[in-house]
Amino acid sequence: VLGQGASTSLQALINSDKARYLGKSVMDQFGNLPYLLKILDVKDMLSIQVHPNKRAAEEGFKKENALAIPLTAPNRNYKDDNHKPEMMVALSDFWLLHGFSPAIDQHLDAYGFLHGFKAIFQAEGIKGLYQQVMELPQEEVDRLIAPHIEVILPLYEAHQLPKSSPDFWAARAVHNFCGDGHFDRGIFSIYLFNILNLKPGEGIFQGAGMPHAYLEGQNIELMSNSDNVLRAGLTPKHVDIPELLANTAFVPTIAKIIPGSLNKTVQLYPCPIGDFSLTAYFLKAGEKMEFTVTSPSIFLMLNGEVQWKGNASADLEGAAAFFSTPGEKLLAEAIVDTNLFWAAVPGQ
């Protein structure tokens, strides 16, 4: 946050007067700003992750504190006692893994290196299948994956695989994560999960227990204020398999993509939790819009130029963001065409 003299962090500003910057309602309910807002530029595939629900986070945080595991330890799962549901909106062509595919049985038939998992899937469903995949000895992971990679890697390097194919991402994962001579077991998950392609302006919500991974593209991500991540592959970092299995939702997922466009005047992204809300706006040059701020809010401009008038006035252009406190009334006038997002706390 820029002000008079040296800059300070938003968290430090909030801590200096929570009643002022959060409002009494949010302060009493959450004790802090209940959300985090990020822009991601995914050039290399990110790890497969699952986030715990609120109760699991509280119990896990308490347990790891009792075990005196340092918050910075690589084997620490719970950095806080909060859940971490997420809403993401694509800013470019965006690819991700999202939940277990309803067509897993077809994938087990279609790919030879997966045939050996058919029996466990038929007997124990998704949970049994995924547990077996995650608990395989590394030598068995390498033995199963290696022959398939030998076939698809030349196709990937010759640009003959479409991004809609799990083979494309499996081959890319080899380049990104398998430099130690072993294959990352997350490669199996690429064939078990939904592969989604969101267009700019489209969004999707990912709740507790939903396995997911961002593969490529730029997006906005709004999430609950937490650092709790249970990793599940495509990473050199710590993977706690028992904790992962205890927090994963083993259900087939039909993706609920929120239709949208970055050229729509107002675009709502419904979030089924009370921690945050997200709305996108496209203001044409000369257009004005009023905002009544009832909760701690972050306004994020992607581009353009806007004259803002409220308790203070500012002319912001390009990529810019600012924090607004409850009770403010803002008037925005676009000097040129501008895309902006408003993150807030609903129901205030």
Task: Indicate where each model-derived feature is located.
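Transition-metal
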Residues: 1-160, 236-254, 278-280
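A short beta-strand-loop-beta hairpin characteristic of the jelly-roll/cupin
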Residues: 2-5, 10-26, 30-33, 100, ...
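Short, conserved beta-strand element in jelly-roll/cupin
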Residues: 39-43, 50, 82-94, 197, ...
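Short acidic-glycine-tyrosine-enriched beta hairpin
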Residues: 40, 195-205, 210-215, 220, ...
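A short hydrophobic beta-strand segment most commonly corresponding to one strand
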Residues: 46, 87-94, 217-236, 276, ...
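Short beta-strand His + acidic residue motifs that chelate non-heme Fe in jelly-roll/DSBH
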Residues: 48-49, 57, 206, 212-216, ...
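C-terminal, non-catalytic macromolecule-binding modules
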Residues: 218-268
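Conserved short histidine dyad/triad with adjacent acidic residue
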Residues: 262-264, 277-293, 326
